[in-house]
Amino acid sequence: MITLAPSLDTPKTDQNQVSDPQTSHVFKSKLPDIPISNHLPLHSYCFQNLSQFAHRPCLIVGPASKTFTYADTHLISSKIAAGLSNLGILKGDVVMILLQNSADFVFSFLAISMIGAVATTANPFYTAPEIFKQFTVSKAKLIITQAMYVDKLRNHDGAKLGEDFKVVTVDDPPENCLHFSVLSEANESDVPEVEIHPDDAVAMPFSSGTTGLPKGVILTHKSLTTSVAQQVDGENPNLYLTTEDVLLCVLPLFHIFSLNSVLLCALRAGSAVLLMQKFEIGTLLELIQRHRVSVAMVVPPLVLALAKNPMVADFDLSSIRLVLSGAAPLGKELEEALRNRMPQAVLGQGYGMTEAGPVLSMCLGFAKQPFQTKSGSCGTVVRNAELKVVDPETGRSLGYNQPGEICIRGQQIMKGYLNDEAATASTIDSEGWLHTGDVGYVDDDDEIFIVDRVKELIKYKGFQVPPAELEGLLVSHPSIADAAVVPQKDVAAGEVPVAFVVRSNGFDLTEEAVKEFIAKQVVFYKRLHKVYFVHAIPKSPSGKILRKDLRAKLETAATQTP
């Protein structure tokens, strides 16, 4: 069973309520609040309208195009739920899903919800230490994965596969592992009757938040049902999806943006989801053309490929009506380049944070009755939520066109960080406001623009790279006395991690040696792209790294490069 850090109840506010003078500038959606069925467990909410589209396609899997209907998806998920129960997984237990995009990922996630357990999703490309950090902190009882990743799971830190924890593989199982059929061939009538409360945890992605190392983010059934409803429910949904739509799912489902805004939103709306395990431009374009993909959820590097790759001209992408870019800011030039490539599509951005469930705002150009929107905006705050912008120094709320830290309040935000009261309290204040660590402003038309970041996090192609994690590894090297990691802007990736390193006295150390030392211990997107050797790391009197000074050094160096 998992133990949660004490949560802070989110205050309920009237639609037009004005708070005290200290928090008087509160922004709401242009769309009216709606009733939300967030009393339902997540799986029940997603399948609430199943009878209306039971025989329509739900999942279309990759180049082979194997298709599962909604009825298939519900049945197989129910069988796996029974199978998990047969293996001893109880309400509140944690199951790790260590898979690339696949139908088995979807079935497993829904099955975990059905028995009141908790899914912690992890990147299968993580190194063994990265996987076991999440596995250990989450106290997972079972891992669902592929055989190719099992070697990473053997005898790490004394935990014995098959004895201390179970591993189920979706393909031929290696020694001491179970085959997925022990789950998928169970009798669906054996799913136990479990009382699930809206505040029970259902998902535990890991996020660094505004600072520090990755932490378990407790998302409840209420969190995720509310977030999905804010996007796709109501007479005029913010994200208008129909049973005729086919959504592109090339972004990894272990990332909350893809899990929520692609998979869960599609399930609720009865749309089909085209699953791709990895991004390969030729395959992507062929599948979009073959399956008449109508909604593409993307990140800026994918936008770059669609806007600039010459292969795009050889395919018919006229079926695409919506392109939603998220996970990292999209530059105006890139946005304009894609508009020129796909003039028929509505292009807009969403803005989110894992801890916020994750969607804070979304382009209203995606609504059933769309609004005019501005280039560069990441939309307006989602309905049934409140947003404010505060001065990071004073905490005073700010009005229109005044940049400050963005804060969000609503029933979609996380319950808290797993076993970390201090981090929870520093992120969600006593009034229920979640502080994002992002700097932005709201313009006169209620559109949100992100301009900077208070938090330390680096975003590489939408993936989180926590500087503290890399700094901890760097200073563990005997030849390194001190180190700091900061982001450097990059056209293709958005940001890349670079390190400033202080050598220990008498030690000789090369840039390549430092890069190799880190590369052996982390997933590919956390690898260092540049190492600068310095005499000292700039720090405040309290010992905090002055990251702004280091970022300024990078910018100066960039302007001086011929």
Curated annotation (Swiss-Prot):
List where Polar residues composition bias occurs.
13-22
Q: Which reaction does it catalyse?
A: (E)-4-coumarate + ATP + CoA = (E)-4-coumaroyl-CoA + AMP + diphosphate; (E)-4-coumarate + ATP + H(+) = (E)-4-coumaroyl-AMP + diphosphate; (E)-4-coumaroyl-AMP + CoA = (E)-4-coumaroyl-CoA + AMP + H(+)
**This protein's record includes keyword ATP-binding:** yes
Source superkingdom: Eukaryota
SBD2: annotated segments: 350-417
- Write out the residues that bind ATP: 207-211, 215, 349-350, 354, 438, 453, 544
Q: Which UniProt keywords apply?
A: ATP-binding, Ligase, Magnesium, Nucleotide-binding, Phenylpropanoid metabolism
Q: What is this protein called?
A: 4-coumarate--CoA ligase 2
What Gene Ontology terms for biological process does this UniProt record contain? Answer: phenylpropanoid metabolic process
Q: Write out the function statement from the record.
A: Carboxylate--CoA ligase that may use 4-coumarate as substrate. Follows a two-step reaction mechanism, wherein the carboxylate substrate first undergoes adenylation by ATP, followed by a thioesterification in the presence of CoA to yield the final CoA thioester.
